[in-house]
Regions:
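Intrinsically disordered or highly flexible coil/loop and linker segments, enriched in small
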Residues: 25, 75, 104-112, 121-125, ...
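General structural signal for secondary-structure boundaries
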Residues: 171-177, 276, 280, 284, ...
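Catalytic nucleotidyl-transfer cores of nucleotide-processing enzymes
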Residues: 239-327
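Active-site-adjacent bridging/hinge elements
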Residues: 266, 328-345
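Hydrophobic, often aromatic-rich secondary-structure segments at membrane interfaces
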Residues: 303, 322-323, 335, 342, ...
Length: 358
């Protein structure tokens, strides 16, 4: 009898829903930070897109993050393996040669670059270190990938993800592709698993995506104590259907990974208590960016007021308003005598120089 079936998966989905609710604020902050990064932050501070006022977006915050990313790229770490004792010297030398080759093969420089962009924006980056069984024509090898924190779910209130009883990573997979990968999962009834993004928060992108043709595939990691030893177990499922379970795999009798640790590593910028995620430079600098742009908005609005003069016109004035408003007209007709009370310029006072200097 299978140890992991529909009942266990349904309970896991209930746990996933609780974990998602626990990190809802973090997910919204990450999505909002991406808008600030793309200089589309006016909508994030409550301004409607139909507002006719100027909405300048200076790149002060953007340039600050770009400079910090350049500093990080100038200091890419390299593995240095040192022996703990004399008998380890030969192994340390071998690892010193092997690890750089693995990192180069995994494209670590790009992973490091992308991870630092994410870390600067959101305060944390997450790296997945897993075993890829398809690498080297099926021989398998270590794989390193960046994981989007929007897709990762852990127990609310813990600071180290290793303390979480369960860990979920959710990916969206096209239904047809899923059927090609696991034909026994859906069978002929390809619509039997509901589509859509129930658990994953979405970025506000320019692309129009159809998530109804995608389904959520969940990587579920959890820990069990067997014979006094903690073991890491793994289950991949879609809907309430099990794709793979390490508990039902005889080759994983000692656990999915022998080190019994989750394959996700969090790297935090500014630490927060009660969560494995930190906060980033956008969280610190967004108010300063907002003040810069709001002051620029005031200056631009006042510049328009100063350059485009407005006038008071008496209701029964002799001035032809249509001709007066049309700057192409060289002549403006009036009926009768034109007095000073018929039309008067609305004076706009110059801005205080202290605002300009700020």
């Amino acid at each position: 009898m299978k140890k992991i079936g529909k009942e266990q998966v349904r309970k896991a989905r209930q746990t996933l829903a609780k974990y998602k609710e626990g990190k809802a604020v973090l997910d919204k902050r990450i999505v909002s930070n991406e808008q600030w990064w793309k200089l589309r932050h006016w909508g994030e501070i409550g301004y409607d897109k139909d507002d006719t006022r100027p909405m300048p977006a200076s790149a002060w915050l953007f340039n600050s993050l770009a400079n910090k990313h350049a500093d990080a790229m100038d200091n890419i770490p390299e593995p240095a393996v040192l022996p703990r004792e004399k008998s380890d010297e030969e192994v340390a030398k071998q690892l010193s040669l092997i690890l750089p080759a693995i990192l180069e093969r995994c494209g670590y420089e790009k992973l490091y670059s992308d991870g630092w962009w994410y870390k600067l924006k959101n305060g944390s980056m997450c790296t997945a270190v897993v075993w890829d069984p398809d690498a080297d024509d099926g021989m398998g090898d270590i794989a390193i990938r960046n994981a989007d924190i929007l897709n990762l779910f852990w127990e609310p209130g813990i600071k180290d993800i290793e303390e979480s009883a369960n860990l979920f990573y959710v990916t969206l997979v096209d239904r047809e592709r899923l059927n090609l990968m696991y034909p026994e999962l859906l069978g002929e009834d390809t619509e039997s698993v509901a589509g859509g993004t129930e658990n994953v928060e979405k970025y506000k992108t320019e692309d129009k995506t159809d998530d109804s043709v995608k389904v959520e595939v969940v990587d579920w990691y959890y820990k069990k104590t067997i014979n006094g030893r903690k073991q890491l177990c793994y289950c991949k499922f879609c809907g309430d259907r099990v794709i793979y379970s390490s508990e039902d795999d005889e080759s994983c009798a000692d656990g999915f990974y022998k080190h019994s640790r989750y394959p996700f590593v969090m790297d935090t910028l500014f630490v927060q208590e009660g969560t494995p995620c930190g906060f980033g430079y956008i969280d610190v600098m967004r108010d300063a960016q907002m003040y810069i742009d709001k002051l620029s908005q005031v200056v631009l609005e006042h510049t328009v007021m100063m350059s485009r003069k407005r006038y008071f016109i008496r209701q029964n004035s002799a001035v032809n308003e249509a001709e007066f408003a049309d700057l192409k007209n060289r002549f403006v007709h009036v009926a009768g005598n034109l007095g000073e009370e018929d039309i008067r310029e609305i004076k706009a006072e110059p801005l205080d120089l202290s605002l300009i200097h700020i």
